[in-house]
UniProtKB/Swiss-Prot annotation:
Upper classification of the organism: Eukaryota, Fungi, Dikarya, Ascomycota, Saccharomycotina
Subunit and interaction comment: Component of the Mediator complex.
Superkingdom field: Eukaryota
Keyword 4Fe-4S carried by entry: no
Its biological purpose: Component of the Mediator complex, a coactivator involved in the regulated transcription of nearly all RNA polymerase II-dependent genes. Mediator functions as a bridge to convey information from gene-specific regulatory proteins to the basal RNA polymerase II transcription machinery. Mediator is recruited to promoters by direct interactions with regulatory proteins and serves as a scaffold for the assembly of a functional preinitiation complex with RNA polymerase II and the general transcription factors.
InterPro entries for the chain: Mediator_Med5_fun
Gene name of the record: NUT1
Organism field: Scheffersomyces stipitis (strain ATCC 58785 / CBS 6054 / NBRC 10063 / NRRL Y-11545) (Yeast)
Protein name (Swiss-Prot/TrEMBL): Mediator of RNA polymerase II transcription subunit 5
Keyword Transcription regulation: yes
Main location: nucleus
Keywords: Activator, Nucleus, Transcription, Transcription regulation
GO cellular component: mediator complex
Length: 981
């Protein structure tokens, strides 16, 4: 070993390279032979660890060092003595970390180690450590850190007793006796009682009498887990006043139904209805006639929809509520058997009474719903028509409900009923207008496919069976196209469907967006879209790839699907979404790593040369523009990664005066070419981030560039105007709401003709039912107490509907998007309730606890899992802490260089141990992997999982949160038991 090697360098290398223990032991032995490691150096370099690691990387280093030190200590008697002799010299918190890890090793891995070493640890070294540490505490009042260390010393000893590591009672007897006498001296009576309970079969009666003491213990309540049963029972729903119980029941109905609307759980009507009945209908009423269940279901869904509208829920959520009411509720009601004995308990009466029970604030919402920019409708009328069309009510019933409605007569109802009963045969229509069409001679417009798709939302509005037929037809066609590789026909289908957001919503409502996403991700990942060198239509083929990308992004954007935690190896689609849509290339750099090799430098040089060629072609007037050879020089997937980088750099160059704006606009004109239009999604989103993050005005460069992109695509007069307009319409569907929000935040935007033009163009091309509102917190309200607002919002949920404010909508969205904060507030309120019994606090705890449970459990398997997990109070949840990309420290490597566009694989080696990076991608398709990873996300990245981490971290009785988390664990377990699924 080189003379320059020190323990510091050895440990640093071990941590950086993640050396195996065997390798480290060999190197350490060599070092120790040449120069004996001194105690001070051992403590500093081996034992001392980072407290409260700031990020995931620091935490991994800390865990690695702890395990390394323990493994080293168990390698020989000399190292064991060195470890225990020095452990007491480091911080008390550090000692606790080592005892926790040793405890786990003792429970699950002790058989791996030499029995004589383990005997020596228990009989000599641990006993000596106990004597040294506990005797050093003296007679003063113990600090929190000292109590914590004493707790873990006892917990480690109890593990020795429970697992009878060496099956030698005499050996364990000595350990227990030494520890018990010192606990008595420190007046830690709860810990002493705990130890004696664990060791009652080991100590003699004389020893127990000698150590048994009922003297006053110091802070007795904080030394061991406190029984929280009485407090937990006082928190139950049954302890609420009758008025508060009614508030609780009405609110959780909304939370339960709204979760269905957000999570696409529409597949099983019978299951939805059964769950509703078991969760919300009193058990004594469940076997009565169906009048009550019909009344409660109709009332709950209409009130829920009204609350969602009042709180400005996402546009797709509002559509899902409406579609569920119109198409699913009639199907559910059709399964009920109304006995025509009592005229007061008919379906008609149930509907009427449900309508009459709705608050005025909800009725006001239901009667003034907008469809499109001008049409106003009453959802109650639409629902009655659906009941008539589904033969649950006679046509004359409409006038009974709405006698003052003159436009919708019985003749109108009968006419619409006849149309409803007409057989659409959607698969045959798609065959006629897509499958059997010769694309070489018939354009998309001439085929009638666009016209068909645009007519379908109205044709399918009332029909559950037709919507299912549509979803099955489209999904089947996508599967068939993947097999036959008919890119052009799939392109036509996607253009026709994705340019109509309402039709897309119907599709994903009835087949789940993840199913559709999986099919499209599979398609694009398995296809390279290569063309022959002499293919003159190669730009068309390239555009097919772009439309697939836009379709995927359109679904995740419009339906708020977060794929940022998913990482599938070799998936171009997920790599593109994460790096070029979510992150907008922000995690890429032009810096070459210091440790780069010759191959890395060659790759970077090739990238720079390619970038220069494209910049010259796009922005240099002296060139002939984009040549076919340049376009074909790289794959279309690489082009879609390169173009956003090119334009970001060109815009940056313009902002610092390196190129003129006129030159930039010449390059922007190329973005109206059909195969390049899909790249504008990333460019526009990047521009919007520039507008939002920097103080901009109407004359700022990002606003000007955005205006040029929008105008050049909308006003294009090329031969493919129809096609390019459809492609850009999908872009507008994706970015349009964000464009309007960002531009309207600019001061005096109304005075800018440029901004008004963009707003007008975008608005004209957006479906008005899918324009998201700006729900950011008003600047005048930026100082509000978020925690208090969360509490108030849940407790006063129904009352707020009478006088809604922007803050209510903001908090409603905040709770939906930031459930972690709800958990933090819940913990604070449970702590507060222990000190002051408050009715408002109690109902909030019940509502927030229900929200935690209901948002985390999607299936019977989930319920069994979490019931079992929380039932075992000693379980640790730290292993389930989700690893997100945002938690990772940035590592400088070629994977983060701009030249990574040459890589079709999405993940480098640095991501291989990510929880959601599945290594079986070679065996399974991206779509199948996506479904598997989504299951993992749902299980390990929910509020119960997050609480479980907090619970495990606060099992130390000295923790200020100890009593709180145990009380809340009981409450959550009770709510899990009560949840029927």
């Amino acid at each position: 070993m080189s003379e320059t090697v020190s323990l510091h360098k050895l440990v640093k290398k071990a941590v950086h390279s993640k050396l195996s223990f065997k390798t480290f032991l060999g190197l350490f032995s060599q070092l120790n032979t040449k120069q004996v490691v001194q105690d001070g150096e051992y403590q500093t370099e081996i034992l001392e660890i980072v407290q409260n690691p700031r990020n995931l990387n620091d935490k991994k280093i800390t865990e690695y060092k702890v395990v390394l030190a323990i493994q080293l200590s168990l390698s020989s008697s000399e190292e064991l003595k060195r470890f225990w002799g020095n452990l007491s010299k480091i911080s008390l918190v550090g000692q606790v970390d080592y005892l926790i890890r040793l405890n786990k090793i003792l429970k699950y891995e002790y058989s791996k180690y030499d029995k004589d070493i383990v005997r020596l640890l228990i009989k000599v070294q641990y006993c000596d450590y106990i004597v040294e540490v506990l005797d050093s505490f003296g007679d003063k009042k113990l600090s929190t850190e000292q109590k914590s260390l004493a707790n873990h010393i006892v917990f480690f000893a109890s593990s020795v007793i429970e697992h009878v590591v060496v099956k030698d009672e005499a050996l364990v007897n000595d350990l227990v006796f030494q520890l018990a006498t010192r606990l008595e001296g420190l007046r830690l009576s709860n810990l002493l009682d705990f130890l004696l309970l664990k060791s009652k079969n080991i100590l003699s009666e004389d020893q127990i009498r000698l150590t048994d003491s009922s003297g006053s213990g110091e802070d007795k309540s904080s030394d061991l887990p406190t029984i929280t049963t009485s407090l937990y029972k006082n928190l139950s729903v049954g302890s609420l006043s009758s008025a508060k119980q009614e508030t609780y029941n009405e609110t959780i109905k909304f939370l339960w139904l709204n979760k269905i609307m957000k999570s696409w759980k529409f597949a099983d009507n019978e299951s939805i209805f059964n769950n509703f009945v078991h969760n919300f209908i009193p058990s004594s009423d469940k076997n009565k006639n169906p009048y009550l269940t019909s009344f409660e279901l109709i009332k709950a869904t209409f009130k829920g929809f009204g609350y969602a509208v009042i709180n400005n829920d996402d546009c797709y959520v509002l559509f899902n509520w409406k579609n569920f009411i119109i198409t699913r509720i009639p199907v559910i009601l059709s399964t009920l058997k109304f006995a025509n004995v009592n005229d007061e308990e008919t379906l008609e009466r149930a509907v009427l009474n449900a309508f009459n029970s709705l608050p005025d604030s909800i009725v006001k919402v239901l009667t003034n719903l907008a469809s499109g920019s001008t049409k106003v409708y009453d959802l109650r009328q639409i629902f009655i028509k659906s009941l008539i069309f589904n033969r649950l009510l006679p046509p004359v019933a409409f006038q009974k409900f709405f006698p003052m409605e003159s436009k919708i007569t019985q003749q109108v109802i009968l006419s619409e009923l006849a149309q409803y009963n007409h057989d659409l045969n959607l698969r045959r229509k798609f065959n006629d207008k897509l499958i059997n069409v010769n694309s070489e001679f018939t354009s998309l417009e001439e085929s009638g496919l666009l016209e068909l798709c645009n007519s379908l939302p109205a044709s399918l509005e009332y029909s559950y069976s037709r919507q299912i037929e549509l979803s099955n037809a489209i999904n089947d066609i996508i599967d068939e196209m993947k097999i036959s590789r008919e890119h052009e026909k799939l392109n036509r289908l996607l253009l026709s469907v994705m340019s109509n957001v309402q039709l897309t919503n119907i599709l994903v409502f009835n087949s789940n967006p993840y199913v559709v996403l999986g099919k499209m991700i599979d398609y694009i990942d398995s296809e390279n879209f290569r063309i022959d060198d002499d293919d003159e239509n190669f730009q068309d083929v390239y555009s097919y790839c772009g439309v697939l990308i836009l379709s995927i992004i359109s679904i995740i954007e419009k339906f708020k699907i977060d794929l940022s935690t998913f990482n599938i190896k070799n998936s171009f689609a997920l790599d593109y979404i994460n790096n070029f849509y979510y992150r907008l290339c922000d995690d890429l750099t032009n810096q070459i790593p210091v440790n780069s090799d010759e191959e890395d430098n060659t790759i970077a040089t090739n990238y720079n040369n390619l970038l220069i060629d494209w910049i010259n072609a796009l922005f240099d007037d002296s060139n002939d523009g984009l040549s076919d050879d340049l376009i074909k020089s790289i794959s279309i997937k690489q082009i879609y990664k390169l173009i956003p980088l090119v334009y970001q750099q060109a815009i940056t160059a313009t902002s610092i005066g390196k190129i003129d704006f006129s030159i930039l606009t010449n390059g922007i004109d190329y973005l109206s070419q059909v195969f390049l239009i899909p790249t504008t999604v990333s460019i526009i989103n990047w521009l919007l981030s520039e507008i939002s993050n920097k103080k901009t005005d109407a004359e700022s460069l990002p606003v000007k560039v955005l205006s040029e992109i929008v105008k050049s695509n909308i006003s294009s007069e090329s031969g493919s105007q129809e096609l390019s307009s459809l492609v850009f319409k999908i872009v507008v569907n994706i970015c349009g709401s964000n464009i309007l929000i960002a531009l309207k935040k600019i001061k005096d935007w109304e005075n800018s003709q440029r901004i008004r033009d963009v707003v007008s163009i975008v608005t004209a091309n957006l479906d008005s039912n899918y324009v998201e509102k700006d729900l950011s917190l008003p600047e005048s309200k930026s100082d509000i107490n978020i925690n208090e607002q969360i509490k108030s919002h849940l407790v006063n949920f129904q009352q707020q509907a009478d006088s809604p404010t922007p803050i209510h909508a903001f908090i409603h969205r905040f709770i939906s998007d930031s459930k972690d904060q709800v958990l933090r507030v819940l913990l604070q309120e449970v702590t507060s309730y222990q000190k002051q019994n408050n009715e408002a606090t109690k109902i909030f705890i019940n509502l927030a606890s229900y929200l935690v449970v209901s948002s985390s459990i999607d299936s019977v398997e989930d319920k069994k899992y979490w019931h079992g997990y929380l039932s075992n109070v000693s379980s640790s949840a730290t292993e389930h802490k989700i690893l997100k990309n945002s938690d990772k420290e940035f590592n400088s490597s070629m994977d983060y260089h701009y030249s990574s566009i040459f890589n079709d694989a999405s993940s480098g080696a640095s991501n291989d141990d990510d929880l959601f990076n599945d290594k079986s991608s070679k065996q399974l398709s991206s779509g199948k992997l996506l479904e598997q990873l989504r299951t993992k996300v749902n299980r390990y990245n929910n509020l119960l999982a997050k609480f479980n981490v907090i619970f495990a971290e606060n099992q130390d009785p000295s923790s200020p949160w100890h009593k709180t988390v145990n009380t809340l664990a009981d409450k959550l377990l009770d709510d899990i038991n009560d949840l029927y699924i």
